Amino acid sequence: MEEFQGYLELYRSQQHDFLYPLIFREYIYALAHDRGLNRSVLLDNVGYDKKSSLLIIKRLISRMYHQNHFIISVNDSNQNKFLGYNKNLYSQMISEGFAVIVEIPFSLRLVSSLEETEIVKSYNLRSIHSIFPFLEDKFPHLNYASDVLIPYPIHLEILVQTLRYYVKDPSSLHLLRLFLHEYYNWNTLITITPKKSIFAKSNQRLFLLLYNSYVCEYESILLFLRNQSNHLRLTSSGILFERIRFYEKIKYPVEEVFANDFPATLWFFKDPFIQYVRYQGKSILASKDTPLLMNKWKYYLVHFWQCHFYVWSQPGRIHRNQLSKHSFDFLGYLSSIRPNISVVRSQLLENSFLMDNAMKKLDTLFPIIPMIGSLAKVKFCNTSGHPISKSSWADSSDSDIIDRFVRIGGNLSHYYSGSSKKKSLYRIKYILRLSCVKTLARKHKSTVRTFLKRLGPKLLDEFFTEEEQIFSLLFPRTSSTLKRFYRGRIWYLDILCINDLVNHE
């Protein structure tokens, strides 16, 4: 009966957007813990103490409401114990539970949108590789592309204010403000690097929720501007940034100043060939029109971030390049538009002649130099690309060492299966293969030549991926099908995150 009562409370909260009572329900934190276990591939799960108590969570929340913020103690920052319990542990539990609760409106909106569009296999759209077929289809017809780095909010209050458009419960938002003020430096500039973040790994889900709501708000307005510029030709549209009256048609001149003292018009956005893709904090804005239009988009985005989100952004963070002459770095690939020339023989009566048919295609290359730099950082090779032994793994068992190297090589082969030229990828696999042999030889105090003679070709076969093994069994080495497999591009729909070696920025 208690289980049904919990589901009833969850259902009522979904219907009325009143999420605050769920914070004091123990099954919410059990759900957050289970989700952490299921998502251990994406986020590191630190687990929970067996002595965790919902009563301690309630006391922490009550303390946040009743404390005097005008009295600042020097030793407050060093106090990690609260009533004899680990304060950081319970702050992590509150953040995890709050993230699960606030995700409810977003999940309901996602389910309804998928039902309206009749998308059955929505999990395929979550794959990173699903972006590249879109790029192959759209980008060969475009001329210019701008690399856009989305700025981070300088104040956490901006994230909370953005979240209120989607969460209609003031009590939950007020608790979020108190929580961020209690456990994090309120005035800290948000900078995300692989090694340092104001949010610890244990609180990544809460940060991702806040940041994604900020990006969702930015993209919803950007999409609205793009759609209005394509369809409204006779009447200009004034952008009202209050979501209650999202937009309205106006009859005033186009020089009309919009809300927040933000002068802008939609007249220079009339380009039906604008395409936009994004992953994390980097996006690509491509167009078929002139460079003048791309420059207008560039300065519009800078002013838009400053006036609406109060985020300082410099024009230098947006780089405009011509697709036919420059490559753009996106999702670990170096992509560019290259002409694909095919010769066609035409026969007209007794005369025949050859014609060159040039078609543009997206070329995705493996970034060999940045990848060697990534391997050098983790001590698989030196900066010149020469393999070295992984000394920190020499104490492990032989099977563990081989499994680690095989797993890294398999992940890289799986992710870069869409590379147009795989010669550079084979060089990286060679570095990992020889680094594995040198690590094993160092462990057994032997030479590489002697160790290879002892193991034979079995060690090298471990580095073949599952797809390569299947194709090598089905087709002979000289068959054209096997050659097309090694040369062709393959996009997978099960890649949900980028490996640390791939993310070499």
Swiss-Prot record:
It is found in: Plastid, Chloroplast. GO terms for cellular component: chloroplast. InterPro entries: Domain_X (IPR024937), Maturase_MatK (IPR002866), Maturase_MatK_N (IPR024942). Coiled coil: none annotated. Belongs to the intron maturase 2 family. MatK subfamily. Usually encoded in the trnK tRNA gene intron. Probably assists in splicing its own and other chloroplast group II introns. This is Maturase K. It comes from Rosa stellata (Star rose). The lineage of its organism: Eukaryota, Viridiplantae, Streptophyta, Embryophyta, Tracheophyta. The gene is matK.
